[in-house]
């Protein structure tokens, strides 16, 4: 339905369906005609029904032209070959190619070669027959026969197992482990009690209490859902806001500090927000390894700088008239000391330590570590079946939909064809990073951050791989590109509709949309420039290898 061939990108019917799937996902995620997680379910369903090896019968597409392959086999043997032998080889090759999951000219050539030489390998061919068969096999690698193999129209399908595996991808388990930690912390009031303790050092000066609120919110957001963190902190803040005089603009600063802290804080760890996990997934697939600890080493400094900038912006835009504010005093409670509470405390500490300490010291990667709180909290009854049902499964399904798009892009060879057809060597890597992150930031301002990352990350990962292969970008540059896009996904916070934390803050009635738009736009643009500069610096000093 589009002139792909004229653009230098010849696509087969399956690849056309994958492109249509991307367009469909983009429109549904942007317009939100249905809940965004249900769009992911539809994406996975349509990929199974229309692009996989288990497609509906009327949608099935031949992976290769049987007549062309049969003719190549016959020409390799030559006119003097036994017709029955040729026919048997043609049948064997056809069956083998139908089962192949990664169909390329080299795979076709190797399959025919194996079938032709089978009598030689098994010892059933005499000397004369062996010589003739070796000559036939040799034709596959030179001359007209070899050229015809290279020009075969081959179609690769997505594999059913690969699509279903997105529901239990290691990154999904990593996120699920984060959910278990967050739910356990909330259930045993670890979050509220930690907030009370952490806010004490900030004293009673409203300016520093504001910074304390942003910092504590950001800290919780690194390990909990941004939305859940914002809901908890705004609930704690509501009675405090009532202490402000109606004309005190500082109320807006306190209301806005929560979504800023939640949105920015999630950037600090791989489990802080889904875009981070999605970026990590595609980096791992391409062999660009960034560990949990590595991410925190550049993510947390970025968060700290952004919090200080956000704090400065809020103080300048919304001066605080209130002279004193003892927020810690308003937060009642104490740490629970029940056996299950101690299980939560110890598991929380052990899990975070294992995530932060490099893998070579204990042998577990971040995904494997995530199973520890899942197992411990399940066995000890900290998390019950009721708690499990209440978890944010919609977020996991949304992320799985993004992974399914990546599977379709890779297994149908659309990503490979994209890489081979576009002159990436001529592209400027800095222009690509700036342009793609601006597009991402714009999209994230108006649609779900996770949906934005799920849509852009598979495409940009393929582009990055192409540029690395073309020599116009190195692996650290590719990592920087994906990390910048992940950061940009979380920085879209200029409007009430940008994120649930923004909507919650706006719903308090203490924030005007104009004030949110101005402060959010300034902060997100500064954050984008800072993230690009940070990735450039890390690449220059060899942080990514």
Whereabouts are the PLM-identified features?
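Generic alpha-helical transmembrane segments of integral inner-membrane proteins
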Residues: 23-26, 45, 176, 180, ...
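Structural signature of hydrophobic alpha-helical transmembrane segments
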Residues: 9-20, 167-177, 226-230, 301-305, ...
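Membrane-embedded alpha-helical segments and adjacent helix-loop junctions characteristic
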Residues: 7, 38, 42-120, 124, ...
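Transmembrane alpha-helix interface/packing and boundary motifs in multi-pass membrane proteins
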Residues: 27-34, 216-226, 259-271, 354-358, ...
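Hydrophobic alpha-helical transmembrane segments
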Residues: 18-19, 38-41, 172, 207-215, ...
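Juxtamembrane and boundary regions of transmembrane helices in multi-pass small-molecule transporters
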Residues: 1-3, 10, 66, 78, ...
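Hydrophobic alpha-helical transmembrane segments in multi-pass integral membrane proteins
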Residues: 268, 274, 350-356, 402-420, ...
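Flexible hinge motifs at transmembrane-helix junctions and intramembrane kinks/re-entrant loops
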Residues: 10-12, 24-42, 163, 227, ...
């Amino acid at each position: 339905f589009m002139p792909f061939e004229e653009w230098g990108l010849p696509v087969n019917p399956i690849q056309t369906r994958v492109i249509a799937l991307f367009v469909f996902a983009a429109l549904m995620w942007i317009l939100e005609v249905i809940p965004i997680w249900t769009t992911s379910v539809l994406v996975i369903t349509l990929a199974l029904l229309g692009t996989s090896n288990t497609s509906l019968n009327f949608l099935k597409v031949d992976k290769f032209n049987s007549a062309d392959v049969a003719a190549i086999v016959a020409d390799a043997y030559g006119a003097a070959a036994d017709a029955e032998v040729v026919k048997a080889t043609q049948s064997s090759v056809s069956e083998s190619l139908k089962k192949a999951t990664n169909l390329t000219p080299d795979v076709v050539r190797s399959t025919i070669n194996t079938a032709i030489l089978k009598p030689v390998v098994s010892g059933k061919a005499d000397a004369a027959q062996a010589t003739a068969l070796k000559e036939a096999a040799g034709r596959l690698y030179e001359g007209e026969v070899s050229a015809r193999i290279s020009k075969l129209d081959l179609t690769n399908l997505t594999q059913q197992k690969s699509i279903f595996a997105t529901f239990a991808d290691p990154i999904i388990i990593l996120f699920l482990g984060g959910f278990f930690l967050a739910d356990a912390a909330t259930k045993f009031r670890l979050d509220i009690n930690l907030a009370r303790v952490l806010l004490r050092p900030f004293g009673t000066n409203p300016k520093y209490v504001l910074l304390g609120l942003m910092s504590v919110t950001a800290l919780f957001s690194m390990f909990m859902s941004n939305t859940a963190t914002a809901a908890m902190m705004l609930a704690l803040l509501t009675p405090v806001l009532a202490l402000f005089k109606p004309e005190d603009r500082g109320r807006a600063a306190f209301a806005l500090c929560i979504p800023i802290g939640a949105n920015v804080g999630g950037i600090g760890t791989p489990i802080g927000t889904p875009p981070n996990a999605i970026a990590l997934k595609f980096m791992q697939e391409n062999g660009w390894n960034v560990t949990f600890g590595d991410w925190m080493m550049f993510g947390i400094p970025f968060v700290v700088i952004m919090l200080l900038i956000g704090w400065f912006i809020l103080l300048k835009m919304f001066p605080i008239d209130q002279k004193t504010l003892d927020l810690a005093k308003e937060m009642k409670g104490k740490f629970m000391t029940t056996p299950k509470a101690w299980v939560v405390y110890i598991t929380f500490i052990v899990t975070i330590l294992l995530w932060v300490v490099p893998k070579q010291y204990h042998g577990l990667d971040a995904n494997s570590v995530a199973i520890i709180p899942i197992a411990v909290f399940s066995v000890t009854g900290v998390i019950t079946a009721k708690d499990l049902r209440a978890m944010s499964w919609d977020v996991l399904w949304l992320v799985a939909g993004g992974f399914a798009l990546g599977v379709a892009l890779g297994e149908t060879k659309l990503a490979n064809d994209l890489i081979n057809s576009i002159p990436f060597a001529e592209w400027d890597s800095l222009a690509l990073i700036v342009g793609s992150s601006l597009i991402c930031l714009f999209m994230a301002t108006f649609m779900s951050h996770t949906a934005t990352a799920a849509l852009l990350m598979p495409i940009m990962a393929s582009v990055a791989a192409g540029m690395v292969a073309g020599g116009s970008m190195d692996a650290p540059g590719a990592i920087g590109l994906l990390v910048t896009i992940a950061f940009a996904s979380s920085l879209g916070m200029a409007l009430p509709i940008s994120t649930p934390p923004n909507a919650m803050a706006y719903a308090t009635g203490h924030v005007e949309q104009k004030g949110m738009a101005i402060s959010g736009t300034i902060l997100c643009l500064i954050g984008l420039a800072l993230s690009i500069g940070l990735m450039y610096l890390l690449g220059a000093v060899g942080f990514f290898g």
